[in-house]
């Protein structure tokens, strides 16, 4: 007699109940073990597949020259000869065009995969923000300029049917011009946030390259990247670096800049004004820009972003102080004392006022902190300008 039987000797009902419970426990353990077995078999299959993939020989990279009939194509291995090769049956032939990058089998040179288009690392290094966190509430004193920018950029992206009903094409690009620090970049980011668009910021000097054709290629790949991530807003800051007036007498470097400019003009002529790519450019020197940039069909709308007036300075101060604890601060007086200051200057003044409060171990900012900040930010600026002017007078 087993121990279980001895335990329930003479009480068969309890023994039967115990056996049923034990059977259920064993069945549950069996199901758990079967589930573990299936999981481990799937993991084994995945690892075997991964091992098989890693053991595959490397493929050559090439480009399609011409697509032929009978599932064949002419391809060229980079820096190598041309081959007439077969196209693998799983390749979508409609996607094969001259210039398409493909992977070629090492042994048969057959096309076995379509590769993504190549991009210069400099293009991939441009500042790409999927959706900026700047909103219209972060901008003060630029209501008129924002309205004009929204009409040219936001409306075509969000409500293209309005332009179709009226029968006009929206502007392809907008040029923002004015002194530095007045909010041109902020306006572009706010528009990108509102339309939920990708924001690509490029400085004009980044498109200037040493060797012939490199700058033009960068511009082309920049617009290709924008089309892939559409809807996209391309913001070209300091466009005067590549968009200055072309002269008859040029050096080698200036000729390369002119080639880059011509590529930019060609790209802006080549995309649909009702498409999902918009261009915003900014400059502090609109007087030196090439007239070809400013003609209708490229930068159709020119928006001046001037230094803020009294009401504009007051709005900007309210924006930058809305999270600050103020005690006895008259923002209207601060706005009067900062005549000629840009939006960036006003932000610096608010930051310096907060730093003065921290220096005094306070959690609130007073009027005196702002007065010290004004003297520090604007006073130093005036002193620097005076020093530069006196230096020019002395040394000519």
From Swiss-Prot:
One Pfam family name from the record? AAA_lid_3
Q: Which GO terms describe its biological process?
A: proteasomal protein catabolic process; protein unfolding
Q: Which InterPro entries match?
A: 26S_Proteasome_ATPase (IPR050221), AAA+_ATPase (IPR003593), AAA_lid_3 (IPR041569), ATPase_AAA_core (IPR003959), ATPase_AAA_CS (IPR003960), NA-bd_OB-fold (IPR012340), Nucleotidase_PAN (IPR023501), P-loop_NTPase (IPR027417)
Recorded GO cellular component terms are: cytoplasm; proteasome-activating nucleotidase complex
Matching SMART domains: AAA (SM00382)
Q: Which family does it belong to?
A: Belongs to the AAA ATPase family.
Free-text function comment from the UniProt entry: ATPase which is responsible for recognizing, binding, unfolding and translocation of substrate proteins into the archaeal 20S proteasome core particle. Is essential for opening the gate of the 20S proteasome via an interaction with its C-terminus, thereby allowing substrate entry and access to the site of proteolysis. Thus, the C-termini of the proteasomal ATPase function like a 'key in a lock' to induce gate opening and therefore regulate proteolysis.
How are the domains described in the entry?
Consists of three main regions, an N-terminal coiled-coil domain that may assist in substrate recognition, an interdomain involved in PAN hexamerization, and a C-terminal ATPase domain of the AAA type.
- The protein here is known as Proteasome-activating nucleotidase
Q: Report the gene name.
A: pan
């Amino acid at each position: 007699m087993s121990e279980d039987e001895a335990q329930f000797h003479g009480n068969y009902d309890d023994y039967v109940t115990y056996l049923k419970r034990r059977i259920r426990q064993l069945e549950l353990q069996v199901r758990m073990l079967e589930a573990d077995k299936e999981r481990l078999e799937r993991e084994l299959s995945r690892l075997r597949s991964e091992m098989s993939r890693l053991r595959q020989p490397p493929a050559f990279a090439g480009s399609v020259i011409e697509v032929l009939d009978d599932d064949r194509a002419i391809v060229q291995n980079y820096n190598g000869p041309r081959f007439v090769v077969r196209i693998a049956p799983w390749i979508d032939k409609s996607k094969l065009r001259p210039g398409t990058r493909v992977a070629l089998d090492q042994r048969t040179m057959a096309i076995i995969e379509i590769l993504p288009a190549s991009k210069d690392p400099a293009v991939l290094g441009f500042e790409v923000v999927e959706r900026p966190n700047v909103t219209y509430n972060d901008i003060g004193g630029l209501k008129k300029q924002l309205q004009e920018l929204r009409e040219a950029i936001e409306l075509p992206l969000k409500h293209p049917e309005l332009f179709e009903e009226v029968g006009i094409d929206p502007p392809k690009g907008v040029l923002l011009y004015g002194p530095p620090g007045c909010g041109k970049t902020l306006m572009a980011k706010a528009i990108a946030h509102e339309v939920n668009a990708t924001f690509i910021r490029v400085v004009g000097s980044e498109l200037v390259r040493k060797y012939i054709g490199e700058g033009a290629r960068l511009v082309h790949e920049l617009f290709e990247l924008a089309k892939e991530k559409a809807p996209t807003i391309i913001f070209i800051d300091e466009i005067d670096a590549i968009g200055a007036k072309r002269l008859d007498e040029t050096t080698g470097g200036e000729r390369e800049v002119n080639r880059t400019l011509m590529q930019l003009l060609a790209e802006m002529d080549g995309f649909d004004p009702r498409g999902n790519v918009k261009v915003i450019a900014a400059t502090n020197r609109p007087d030196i820009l090439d007239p070809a940039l400013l003609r209708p069909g490229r930068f159709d709308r020119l928006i001046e972003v001037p230094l803020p007036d009294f009401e504009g300075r007051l709005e900007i101060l309210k924006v930058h102080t809305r999270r600050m604890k103020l005690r006895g601060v008259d923002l209207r007086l601060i706005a009067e004392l900062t005549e000629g200051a840009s939006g960036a200057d006003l932000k610096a003044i608010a930051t310096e006022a907060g730093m003065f409060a921290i220096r005094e171990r306070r959690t609130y900012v007073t009027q005196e902190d702002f007065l010290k900040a004004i003297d520090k930010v604007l006073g130093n600026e005036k002193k620097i300008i005076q020093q530069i002017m006196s230096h020019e007078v002395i040394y000519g």
